[in-house]
Amino acid sequence: MNQTQPYMDVHSSHLSSAQPYASHAATAGAMAHYPQYHQQPPVLQPASTYGPASSYSQYAYPSGVASSQTAPPPPSTSMSSQVPAQLLPLPVNSHTVTAPGYGNTTGTPMQGFVYDTTGQLAPPGAKPRVTATLWEDEGSLCYQVEAKGVCVARREDNHMINGTKLLNVAGMTRGRRDGILKSEKVRHVVKIGPMHLKGVWIPFERALEFANKEKITDLLYPLFVHNIGGLLYHPTNQTRTNMVVQESQQRRLEGPPSARTPQASQPPALHHHHSMQTSIPSQMPQPPTMSSQPGARPPLDRAHTFPTPPASASSLMGLSNQSSSYDWNNQGMNSGVPNTQPLSIDTTLSNTRSMPTTPATTPPGNNLQGMQSYQSQSGYDTSKPYYSTAPPSHPHYAPQYSLSQYGQPMPPHSYIKNEMAPPAGRAPGGQSETETSDVKPADRYSQSNGHVTAGAGESAPEHESEYVQHDNTGYGASRSSYTYTTNTSVGSLAGEHSQLTNDITGSPQQNGSGRMTPRTGGGPPPQWASGYASPRPTAASSLYNIVSDTRGSSNGAGSENYTVASNTAPTYSMGGSLGSGKRGREDDDMGRPDSQGDYESKRRRTNETTVGGPVGGVLLGLQPMKAGGAMPRRR
């Protein structure tokens, strides 16, 4: 009679309120201990219906409708754990059979037993072990029968049977099994879901044929019983069966399985959503723990009522104006909120309930100091938000990096005179502004983007004065930032791309934009040698000033229409003279087609309206500004 002990010990997990079976059966030496259960009605109420103690050997399956041992489906175990103990056992016959040896486990017909090919008749000694599981993915109830440690399932709606598990019971090899199942005309392949439901599902008739062919029909009893639900609807087991069926019908009415959540985790999730979005439920037990610890941080067991804030939540929640009613350290806990009114906490944080708040609802806290310091340390004018795109790699150039590149239509003279002080090294050699205006215009005709894009309605002489003044500041600043040696012999490098005409390079200088394209960029300015007399490399240098801002401190600052400041030819043609200026003009005339007549007239007019008179006087004025006393290369 002790053969039932290991079975009951194994299946103790399926007994919801009958744990004393396992504990006593493990220690009991004989069946004499079982009459103790008759004196324990609180533990097992229906003990009087079990009969004498000897009937336990006949009832070898204490979890009659619980799931099997090897492949327990999750829904059935949860169902059986919720059912009272009096619903579990099935009434048994009076024949005495040992627990493990029911039915035919050999795979061969028993002696004296007519083999039932229909699967309707129970083999001698076999008991209908059927479990029902709700298959959520398919929305159907599944009847499950275990044989040889394999759980074979059958659907309730179309009565298809898992052929993969069926042939596994037969001990068939994988290759042969898959070959047979692939040749089936009607089959349903399931690849997602519980393990015992995966596989190839075949119709009921084909499954019965396979079972008869492999001689496993009696092993699978009652899988092929037509009214398999009747075995589940046992009178003693009626309540549990109704629970399973009602749940399956309720699941069908609820809709597709994707919209459903597991039954066990649903109520906490709903409470969590209510506590996050609406007022905190008063029936939740956590708010008293909030005020029971007035001086400490809120405990972690309040996860359902209010989330514990992250480390940086003090700036996210904007406690500058809300810390009086709720603070995470010690203010909100003892602020006089009763245990029954946790709603004040909820109302103070209603607008910042979603943790990543936007700056629209968050006052500037500590997290905004990073942006403010970024604007202040790079020296931008905070009233002009378009400065924020300036590259921060040259922070000391940032104040002058602005208006010409970011579309401010401010006139050049007003910006220079009002907003920017002249640099210290403005006129090297003690030169005055009038001398500078004498000096500049001689070579300014060679700069191809001179003032074609002058502002509408502004005359050229106005621009000349401002332009010369602006060039002088750019010249002085560029002299301080870059010291060009007088005898660098890299003229050939610069000449390779700086002598290209502006039509070849397609510069936008002639169309009035005043900006350079990367094709006209040429090379970096240190490559333009001092002895190279043509002043056109300065046109290419304007792109370098726009892009990298490593030239003068006022390069991009002056005007919308003329971005480069250090565009005077003497900056680069150090060894130039009157002849070099003439040569630049001749080259300019040769390289320019006839289609640019308007620019030609503009250029000559700026040349005619110079302040300094003849060109020779200009070259005399240039002498103090040269970097060195190098002799002219040619005349």
Curated annotation (Swiss-Prot):
Q: How does inactivating the gene affect the organism?
A: Impairs the ability to undergo asexual reproduction with abnormal morphology of conidiophores and only small numbers of dysmorphic conidia exhibiting precocious germination. Displayed reduced expression of the catalase gene cat1 and hypersusceptibility to hydrogen peroxide. Impairs the production of ergot alkaloids such as chanoclavine-I, festuclavine, fumigaclavine A, fumigaclavine B, and fumigaclavine C. Impairs A.fumigatus immunoglobulin E-independent mast cell degranulation induction.
Q: What domain of life does the UniProt record list for this protein's source?
A: Eukaryota
Q: Name one GO biological process term.
A: conidium formation
Q: Does the keyword NADP apply?
A: no
Region ranges (Disordered): 1-21, 63-82, 246-480, 498-635
Basic and acidic residues compositional bias, start-end: 460-469, 583-592
Question: HTH APSES-type domain location, by residue?
Answer: 129-235
Q: Name the InterPro entries on file.
A: EFG1/Phd1/StuA (IPR029790), HTH_APSES_sf (IPR036887), KilA/APSES_HTH (IPR018004), Tscrpt_reg_HTH_APSES-type (IPR003163)
Q: For bias kind Polar residues, which ranges apply?
A: 326-355, 498-513, 539-571
Keyword Zinc listed? The answer is no
- According to the UniProt record, which residues make up the DNA-binding region? 163-184
Composition bias of kind Low complexity appears in 276-294, 312-325, 356-380
Task: Write down a Pfam family by its short name.
Answer: KilA-N
Q: Which GO terms describe its molecular function?
A: DNA binding
- Keywords from the UniProt entry: Conidiation, DNA-binding, Sporulation, Transcription, Transcription regulation
Return the annotated region ranges for Nuclear localization domain: 582-605
Q: Which family does it belong to?
A: Belongs to the EFG1/PHD1/stuA family.
| Function (record text) | Transcription factor that regulates asexual reproduction. Binds the StuA-response elements (StRE) with the consensus sequence 5'-(A/T)CGCG(T/A)N(A/C)-3' at the promoters of target genes. Controls the expression of 6 secondary metabolite biosynthetic clusters including 2 involved in the synthesis of alkaloids (fumigaclavine and fumitremorgen), 2 clusters of the ETP class (gliotoxin and an unknown ETP-like toxin), a cluster predicted to produce pseurotin A, and the product of the last cluster is unknown. Controls the production of ergot alkaloids during conidiophore development.
Q: What PANTHER family does this protein's entry cite?
A: PROTEIN SOK2-RELATED
This chain belongs to which protein, by name? Answer: Cell pattern formation-associated protein stuA
